[in-house]
A protein has these predicted regions:
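Short, conserved beta-strand segments within well-ordered enzyme catalytic domains
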Residues: 46-48, 58-60, 116
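N- or domain-start disorder-to-order transition segments that initiate the globular core
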Residues: 7-52
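Active-site recognition of the HExxH zinc-binding catalytic motif
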Residues: 69-81
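Secondary-structure transition/turn motif
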Residues: 39-40, 50-51, 62-64, 120-121
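Short pre-active-site segment immediately N-terminal to the catalytic Zn-binding motif
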Residues: 60-70
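Short, conserved catalytic-motif segment at the N-terminal edge
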Residues: 53-57
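Charge-rich, well-structured scaffold segments of protease-associated domains
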Residues: 2-16, 64, 78-273
């Protein structure tokens, strides 16, 4: 694969609308690193060509938060709740059960969000890439507001003990109920920030890096999460989840020509991307 990549990816040439900008050997990884840029979309790509049977793909986006609503953390969860091409409720869970993946995850950092996958089977890699790329570029969040409510936050009414099973829906029972916030990320961050060291870490970052993205809790502060609206959520996705703001990584013993053609034809040259 390294010899084939060297013949295909010559600096100064193009391949499937990718301009090959640089090539360097990385002895520590026993690999050759190729830096490419997709001409039409502006997407950047790093390909580490090596003999590792594990084939990996990742797409990341620059996502520096402007507040502590956790919008990028909620987006990370939400885009993996179905997409145009894969309209299932939990494609992430389905992939864990059905694919031959050796690694499958999504992570929100203080300034970026990354979606990595790995497998030893090349066809499985393209299946995983297809699901992840459609998830980030064509998620179901635009047609299903309930995804935002489920993964981000929503109101929930706790009825008095015994009232829930009565089924009369009486206004008296409703008035006696307690309104509270609920949501996957909301509850996750309540747990994370129940650790005093996490709270201290946030306070230190806010003091050291005021007026920067690092002053905010990228995962979301439960006190700030309910300030996020569905419209702000969609606008944030539209502004950040596009190829020009992305960095793609490919790694391992794979067919670079096929991989670049797949990325170009299926996603990067498509209007939706």
């Amino acid at each position: 694969p390294r010899a084939a990549a060297a013949a295909l990816l010559v600096p100064g040439t193009t391949c499937h609308d990718f301009a090959v900008e640089r090539c360097e050997t990385v002895p520590e990884l026993d690999s050759d690193a190729y830096v490419l840029r997709h001409i039409a979309s502006g997407a950047r790509l790093l390909y580490l060509a090596c003999d590792d049977e594990n084939k990996a793909f990742a797409i990341g986006f620059k996502t520096p938060p402007a507040d502590s609503t956790g919008v990028f953390h909620i987006l990370e969860h939400s885009v993996l709740c179905g997409s145009d091409k894969f309209p299932v409720k939990e494609p992430f869970v389905d992939l864990i059960k059905s694919s031959m993946q050796t690694f499958l995850n999504a992570m929100t950092y203080p300034d970026k969000t990354i979606y990595p996958v790995a497998t030893t089977n090349e066809q499985d890699l393209y299946n995983l890439m297809d699901v992840y790329l459609d998830a980030v570029f064509n998620p179901a969040i635009y047609t299903k507001p309930t995804i935002f409510e489920q993964e981000g936050w929503h109101y929930e009414l706790d009825l008095p003990e015994g009232a829930e099973g009565e089924g009369d829906g009486s206004s008296a029972s409703l008035r006696e109920g307690t309104l509270r916030y609920n949501g996957v990320v909301f509850n996750e961050m309540k747990g994370a920030l129940s650790d005093p060291m996490s709270v201290l870490d946030d306070a230190v970052n806010a003091a050291l890096y005021p007026d920067t993205a690092y002053a905010h809790e990228s995962g979301g502060d439960p006190r700030a999460i309910p300030a996020l609206t569905y419209e702000q959520f969609l606008d944030t996705h539209a502004r950040h989840y596009n190829p020009s703001n992305s960095y793609i990584t490919l790694y391992g013993d794979l067919d670079a020509d096929r991989a670049l053609a797949f990325l170009d034809e299926r996603y990067l040259s498509q209007p939706s991307a």
